[in-house]
């Protein structure tokens, strides 16, 4: 049984204050023209004083960042309806909008916010003028309002109003695309600031960079954070004791365990889809090799062998095999290993190098760092056909991490001569940048659904 360690670093739990000076902010760089127009009408506030967060603005930003929607600017809206009965369907149809979200917010006696909101199908409403009818259970014709895709109400504490806005974004996204939204998720990453007393900092933020919180800071390097499937823990690499060691930390309680501390290198931890096993890389026998560690029994199993270096393991969604990067062919390429029989095959062939591979949640695509004449860029490979599409044109891309719905990828790149976090949609049409203001930002990891 592993010894549970008290933190020797400074740890701040997730409820601590955010570091405003270090906040990340999404800057959209490409892809908006190809997105679907949608109207996010400013929610009516029926109370005194300002709201702690602009709910409709958060929703509009979320949908825009997905790369699939282009919210209409409020200055271009022909009207600001607050319910489906006030919608002028012809006016919105003329603007090219086929969906509209509207709502209102009040405050109850307990000081909580009551949010009412509706998603409206403008095309359907324009065809029926909002007067479609259907038979009731009693056999009478009644207004069906089938142009209202959903009509919801929620009571939310003020400190969670922005969080609930992400929830609304998820509902809208799923209703209109048929895919689960990933706006109510988090990212973890490492910030390096050589001028700070603790140059290495592990931080967690909402997917869009807001509510950034310090999780851990150290005078020695921190690397390779990876989320557990339940979103409560992070596995990471620390050099606090003079060599690379793997730890698992509960980001809510601060409790952590040292998982491995073998001679030489311990790195690249990855939780299995069921959270019971950790894939990792050790060099205790010489070259870098991939292992799996059963977290209950602590049984260590060696997966790769030989003189070549094998690293960066990542689990298939079914948990039955791993992909990893190996230089066994001379230069880094990505391979697949079946965990039941250790049969191994190379899966990347296009480009002089391919590394940092991850598989989308649906198992269809491999996302990787591809080296070609243009440098190191993110690429997507269809695992059935082998077709490869280069997704980015940024500089020295590394450490891709896929959103839990498979729609976006976050990664580290170079901008203005420093490491920043960037995003790209899975089809490569939409790109965004999350610039940091006080350090180099590396090793991003996208959380599971929360």
UniProtKB/Swiss-Prot annotation:
One GO cellular component term noted in the UniProt record for this chain: periplasmic space
Listed GO biological process terms: cell division; protein import
Highest taxon above the source species: Bacteria
Parts forming coiled coils: none
Subcellular location: Periplasm
InterPro entries found in the cross-reference section: 6-blade_b-propeller_TolB-like, PD40, Tol-Pal_TolB, TolB_N
Pfam families: PD40 (PF07676), TolB_N (PF04052)
Signal peptide feature range: 1-22
Gene3D superfamilies, sorted: TolB, C-terminal domain, TolB, N-terminal domain
Record keywords: Cell cycle, Cell division, Periplasm, Signal
Family, similarity comment: Belongs to the TolB family.
Function in brief: Part of the Tol-Pal system, which plays a role in outer membrane invagination during cell division and is important for maintaining outer membrane integrity.
Subunit structure: The Tol-Pal system is composed of five core proteins: the inner membrane proteins TolA, TolQ and TolR, the periplasmic protein TolB and the outer membrane protein Pal. They form a network linking the inner and outer membranes and the peptidoglycan layer.
UniProt-recorded name of the protein: Tol-Pal system protein TolB
Organism: Vibrio atlanticus (strain LGP32)
Gene: tolB
């Amino acid at each position: 049984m592993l010894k549970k360690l008290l933190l020797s670093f400074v740890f701040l739990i997730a409820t601590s204050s955010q570091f405003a000076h270090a906040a990340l902010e999404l800057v959209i760089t490409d892809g908006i023209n190809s997105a679907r127009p949608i109207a996010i009408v400013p929610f009516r506030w029926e109370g005194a004083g300002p709201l702690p967060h602009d709910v409709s603005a958060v929703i509009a930003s979320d949908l825009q960042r997905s790369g699939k929607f282009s919210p209409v600017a409020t200055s271009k809206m022909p009207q600001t309806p607050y319910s489906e009965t006030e919608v002028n369907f012809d006016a919105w149809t003329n603007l090219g909008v086929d969906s509209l979200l509207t709502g209102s917010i009040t405050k109850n006696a307990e000081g909580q916010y009551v949010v009412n909101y509706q998603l409206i199908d403008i095309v359907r409403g324009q065809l029926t003028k909002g007067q479609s009818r259907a038979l009731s259970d009693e056999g009478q014709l009644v207004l069906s309002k089938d142009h209202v895709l959903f009509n919801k109400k929620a009571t939310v504490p003020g400190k969670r109003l922005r969080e609930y806005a992400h929830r609304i974004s998820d509902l809208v996204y799923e209703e209109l695309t048929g895919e689960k939204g990933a706006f109510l998720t988090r990212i973890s990453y490492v910030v390096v600031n050589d001028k700070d007393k603790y140059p290495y900092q592990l931080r967690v933020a909402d997917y869009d960079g807001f509510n950034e919180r310090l999780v851990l800071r150290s005078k020695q390097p921190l690397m390779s954070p990876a989320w557990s499937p339940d979103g409560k823990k992070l596995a990471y690499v620390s050099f606090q004791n003079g060599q690379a060691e793997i730890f698992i930390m509960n980001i809510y309680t601060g409790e952590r365990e040292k998982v491995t501390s073998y001679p030489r290198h311990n790195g690249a931890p990855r939780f299995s889809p069921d959270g019971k096993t950790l894939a990792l890389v050790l060099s205790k026998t010489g070259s870098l090799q991939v292992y799996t560690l059963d977290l209950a029994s602590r049984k260590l199993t060696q997966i790769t062998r030989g003189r070549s270096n094998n690293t960066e393991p990542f689990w298939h969604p079914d948990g039955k095999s791993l992909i990893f990067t190996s230089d066994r062919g001379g230069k880094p390429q990505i391979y697949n290993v079946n965990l039941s029989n250790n049969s191994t095959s190379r899966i990347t062939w296009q480009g002089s190098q391919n590394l940092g591979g991850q598989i989308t949640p649906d198992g269809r695509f491999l996302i990787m760092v591809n080296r070609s004449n243009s440098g190191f860029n993110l690429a997507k490979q269809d695992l059935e056909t082998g077709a490869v599409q280069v997704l980015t044109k940024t500089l020295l891309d590394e450490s891709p991490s896929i959103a839990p719905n498979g729609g976006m990828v976050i990664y580290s790149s170079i901008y203005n001569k420093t490491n920043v976090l960037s995003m790209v949609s899975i089809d490569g049409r939409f790109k965004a940048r999350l610039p940091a203001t006080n350090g180099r930002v590396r090793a991003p990891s996208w959380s599971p659904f929360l």
